A protein has these predicted regions:
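Phosphate-group recognition and catalysis centered on beta-loop-alpha active-site segments
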Residues: 14-322
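Sec-dependent N-terminal signal peptides
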Residues: 3-13
């Protein structure tokens, strides 16, 4: 556990550090999420970190995909109609990595209606985009860092580990060795590992021995695995998290209420935790916020965020004067 003196020093350091800009699924505000093209654009924009949501394929290959389902961002229903489950959905875990590689990725749409979720973004069905594996993405980022002359970090999320376990697969057990093999293993490496499930975060630290930076993601009240988010947001909950993780990732709705900053970040800093809220979208501003500049002021100056997940890294970087 951290001493009171160390926690106080961490709180001061957190407030002094320049905030990091995290490309949420890449530059997903202008290109289909988690595609190679989206990550290249985000890197060129200058994002500090590029996010990877990670799920498993049938043959245990980590895939960069936001959901365990494939039917909201690909043409899986057209190419593999026989893989539809009784609930009407198509799961990455039911296709091999080679099969997933044949799918065409597109802008997110409602799997029931086929309508694009964000109609003013990249047109659904336009262009040829693919779903990458984690290994492919890490290789891409390494090459972008080499040719771009700067080292952008990675920000992988273990998606639904308890669901994967029910399906007979150990997501973290497969992903962590790949991260280590690619040079992401310690606190000094530019990598934040994130997850919404408290039990899995605890397992990552205590059972799997992960020494790198970890962010505990916080949802509304209770997670599908039983994680009590409301309790974790209390002073006692934040203090308890400080002995396990490096920071928290709350929703922007917990940071901004009717155009005003809440006290969550200040309380987290007091506990010695970094705070990287999600997700800022320039085309869907928080309630009570008139533009990107005002949002940046509230999030970084008033609330004191140490970083921000955004679909529009270029706009956030501009607001920060970078």
């Amino acid at each position: 556990m951290r001493s009171a003196g160390l926690v106080a020093l961490l709180a001061v350091a957190l407030q002094a550090a320049e905030p990091v800009v995290i490309a949420h699924r890449g530059a997903s505000g202008i290109l289909p999420e988690h595609t190679r093209e989206s990550k290249i654009a985000a890197h060129r924009m200058g994002a500090d970190y590029l996010e990877q949501d990670v799920v498993l394929s049938k043959d245990d290959v980590p895939i960069v995909l936001h959901d365990v389902h494939l039917d909201t961002t690909t043409d899986v229903a057209e190419k593999f109609s026989d893989r539809r489950r009784k609930d009407g959905r198509y799961y990455a875990i039911d296709l091999t990595a080679a099969e997933i590689a044949t799918l065409t990725a597109t802008e997110r749409f409602d799997h029931r209606t086929g309508k694009q979720v964000m109609p003013l973004r990249h047109p659904k069905g336009k262009g040829v985009f693919r779903v990458p594996t984690l290994e492919q993405e890490l290789a891409l980022i390494a090459e972008l860092n080499r040719t771009g002359g700067r080292r952008a970090g990675i920000y992988p999320e273990l998606k639904a580990p308890s669901w994967h376990r029910k399906e007979g697969k150990d997501l973290a057990g497969i992903v962590l060795p790949i991260l280590r093999k690619n040079g992401y293993a310690t606190q000094s490496d530019p990598c934040y590992l994130q997850c919404f499930e408290y039990a899995e975060v605890k397992r990552i630290r205590e059972e799997l021995g992960w020494k790198g930076s970890v962010i505990m993601l916080l949802g509304g009240n209770k997670g599908v695995d039983g994680t009590d988010f409301a309790a974790l947001k209390t002073d006692a909950g934040l203090k308890g998290l400080a002995g396990l993780v490096d920071g928290i990732g709350p929703s922007l709705t917990d940071i901004i209420k009717d155009g005003k900053a809440t006290d969550l970040i200040a309380r987290a800093h007091k506990a010695g935790l970094k705070v990287h809220p999600y997700t800022f979208r320039a085309d869907a501003l928080p309630k009570g916020v008139k533009d990107v500049a005002e949002a940046a002021r509230i999030i970084f100056k008033d609330a004191g965020a140490d970083g921000l997940f955004t679909d529009h890294p270029d706009k956030v970087l501009e607001a920060l004067g970078r």
